[in-house]
Amino acid sequence: IKPGTKDVFKGLAIYGEGIQNLMNDAPTDIGIQNDFGNTVSPVKGVALPIASFMAYLDHSWNESFSSSVGYSLVQITNSDGQAADAYHKGQYASANLLYYPLPNLMAGAEVIWISRDNYKDGFHSSATKIQVSVRYNFSHTLGKH
């Protein structure tokens, strides 16, 4: 979606069961559901519900500078038989400033924040990092002068 001449919005929302293989962060599609009243099959495999969304805004400041800022979330509804340290929720946010001094050269800096919560063991971890990148695009076709 282009909300303005210098902006591009990218968004996605998804919900499903057993689709974790389609996600980068979510590791398990099927969880153990306890059914202790059933002596023949006291546990069964169930497709785990997952909800996820992401939203990013790309902005062109001028011919030499651009930025992206955004956020994403993935959250699993865990089954009661999963381990306490099973993946439950992950979050990711980033913002950058890119500089294009020449047509084939880009340099930029980005701040990234990540977070993970486990199912039941109370584990929570987050980290913030700064990343610096330089990219030069080049090409040459052999046999052409």
Residue ranges and their predicted role:
Residues I1-G4, A95, G108, Q131:
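Transmembrane beta-barrel strand/turn architecture of Gram-negative outer membrane proteins
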Residues I1-G81, Y87:
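Detector for outer-membrane/organellar transmembrane beta-barrel domains
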Residues I1-P3, H59, Y99, W113, ...:
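Residue-level signature of outer-membrane beta-barrel architecture
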Residues D7-F9, S64-S67, Y99-A109, H140-H145:
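Repeated loop/turn-to-beta-strand initiation elements of outer-membrane beta-barrel proteins
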Residues G11-E17, V69-L73, A93-A95, A109-W113, ...:
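Transmembrane beta-barrel strands of outer-membrane/channel proteins
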Residues A51-A55, Q91-A95, T128-V132:
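Hydrophobic, lipid-facing positions within transmembrane beta-strands of outer-membrane proteins
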Residues N96-L98, L102-Y119, H124-A127:
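Internal helix-turn-beta structural module
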Residues S125-H145:
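Outer-membrane beta-barrel "beta-signal"
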